[in-house]
């Protein structure tokens, strides 16, 4: 009873704090002068991390196993990983470009786990025989950590696409206005050459320089986080194959979860391949990573929605009249 009460308190404290962090974070986006608000949001995420850590430890103690055996527990674990990713730049004293991604991700993931799922899914259950293995911690923790990192990296790539395409649309719009004003051809050519010279100078406008810096940082952090996520995903798939051989006598069975995990791994393998090609990196790799964002959610929720296959433990229970 004490553990259940403590879990309930920690769940609602962490969700309340991260809700306040979201409000503070958007205020700092609107008003950059409030440095104190930024520090408060970071401390709030730190509080959320400790609450989620306490929640996982509490659930681990009274359930007797690492709380990653069903959808509710994996969502809480996913929120915990998001909070860790959020704090890495903060402790390294870097500008936290990830906060726009990780704070809302923590909020929506934990919100769905706390309020969106059925109440009976919050109750810890005895592990089914197939999950009573030492491979549970290795396989599931690596997979969920990989999902979290890949989701964050994919969202950074999507943000890069939005900023880049907004710039392209603005430039195209300006060029169309020039043509509609019926400038002489030589004057248009002169203006385009002048624009090209200004573009290549070492003294760009502060607005363009900030945009360029932001794109570079999004690309840098996106690549690093996706690299970590891809490594975790690979380890998770390999450890799962070994576990499957012990449990079912086969390394691979092509059930829905395994199939979509392979598709996810392939998509991000293509992403890293595009990064090695100078002609394909940048926008092309960002597009691939953005597609990967959708694939991850299909892989993560697909089996739980269908409730079929060897990985259907802890799936949604469909109630029919």
Swiss-Prot record:
Superkingdom of source: Eukaryota
Keyword Transmembrane among record annotations: yes
Record's GO cellular component terms: chloroplast thylakoid membrane
Subcellular location: Plastid, Chloroplast thylakoid membrane
Main location as per UniProt: plastid
Alphabetized UniProt keyword annotations: Chloroplast, Cytochrome c-type biogenesis, Membrane, Plastid, Thylakoid, Transmembrane, Transmembrane helix
GO biological processes: cytochrome complex assembly
GO molecular function, one term: heme binding
Mode of membrane association: Multi-pass membrane protein
Transmembrane portions of the chain: 17-37, 48-68, 71-91, 98-118, 143-163, 225-245, 259-273, 286-306
The keyword Plastid belongs to this UniProt entry's keyword annotation: yes
NCBIfam families xref list: cytochr_II_ccsB (TIGR03144)
Function statement: Required during biogenesis of c-type cytochromes (cytochrome c6 and cytochrome f) at the step of heme attachment.
Family: Belongs to the CcmF/CycK/Ccl1/NrfE/CcsA family.
Self-association state and partner proteins as the record states: May interact with Ccs1.
Full protein name: Cytochrome c biogenesis protein CcsA
Organism expressing this protein natively: Populus trichocarpa (Western balsam poplar)
Gene that specifies this protein: ccsA
